[in-house]
Regions:
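S-adenosyl-L-methionine-dependent methyltransferase catalytic module, highlighting the catalytic core
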Residues: 65-66, 76, 80-185
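Conserved SAM-binding loop
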Residues: 3-89
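Polar low-complexity intrinsically disordered regions
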Residues: 1-4, 131
Length: 185
C-alpha cells in the first residue's frame, strides 16, 4: 500500500495527483495544503518525502535556488524529483507574465556533485541532486502547436537530444519544455 504522506505534488493547480499531497497557493478541489511556495520554510518536516513532482511551477517562484534548497530539505535521501519547466528560449518561458525564468538542460547540473558546474561553483547552494535524466518537449509545425491535432513530442534518445539541443540553443521555439528527473544525494 502506497503512503500518500511521502509523495508531494508542488504547485498542483488543477492537476491533482492521486496518492500525493497536493500543494497550491490557492484552495481548489483536491488541493490538500494551501501554501505560497515563495514563503520559506515550506510547511513540511525535513526528510519527509520519497517523491516530489513539480510540473510547470518552479518557473513561477521568486528564488529558484531557495526553492531547490527547500526541495532538498523536505526530501529523503535518494528521493526522486520530477520537474517540467519551460526551455530558456521558448516563448513558453515568457508568454506567461508570472514566469520568472526559463531553464537550460545544464541548469540543474549546478546541483549535481559529479558535474563540473557544481564542482566549480559549489558555493551556490548546499542542495545536491544527481541528474538522472532529462528530455526535451518539442512541438512540430510551430506556431501551430496550439491546434488540437498537433501533439507534443518528447525527445529522450541521447543522439536526438544532442541534435535537438544544438538546434534549440541556436533557434528559438524548437524546444518548448525541459523535463528533468533528479535524485536527492
Amino acid at each position: 500500500m502506497e503512503n500518500k504522506l511521502d509523495k508531494l505534488n508542488l504547485g498542483s493547480g488543477n492537476e491533482i495527483k492521486e496518492g500525493f499531497i497536493n500543494v497550491d497557493f490557492k484552495q481548489d478541489k483536491g488541493v490538500d495544503i494551501v501554501h505560497d511556495l515563495n514563503k520559506h520554510p515550506w510547511p513540511f518536516e525535513n526528510n519527509s518525502f520519497k517523491e516530489v513532482v513539480a510540473e510547470n511551477v518552479i518557473e513561477h517562484l521568486d528564488n529558484f535556488i531557495q526553492a531547490m534548497e527547500e526541495i532538498y530539505r523536505v526530501t529523503k535521501p535518494n528521493a526522486s524529483i520530477k520537474m517540467s519547466v519551460p526551455y530558456w528560449n521558448s516563448s513558453f518561458a515568457y508568454i506567461d507574465p508570472t514566469h520568472k525564468r526559463g531553464f537550460h538542460e545544464h541548469t540543474f547540473s549546478f546541483f549535481d556533485p559529479e558535474s563540473p558546474y557544481c564542482k566549480q561553483r559549489s558555493y551556490y547552494s548546499k542542495a545536491r541532486f544527481k541528474v538522472k535524466s532529462f528530455s526535451f518537449v518539442i512541438a512540430p509545425f510551430a506556431p501551430y502547436f496550439l491546434l488540437p491535432f498537433v501533439k507534443n513530442i518528447e525527445i529522450k534518445n541521447f543522439i536526438l537530444k544532442k541534435i535537438i539541443g544544438l538546434l534549440g540553443n541556436m533557434f528559438s521555439n524548437i524546444i518548448l519544455e525541459l523535463r528533468v528527473e533528479l535524485q536527492r544525494v
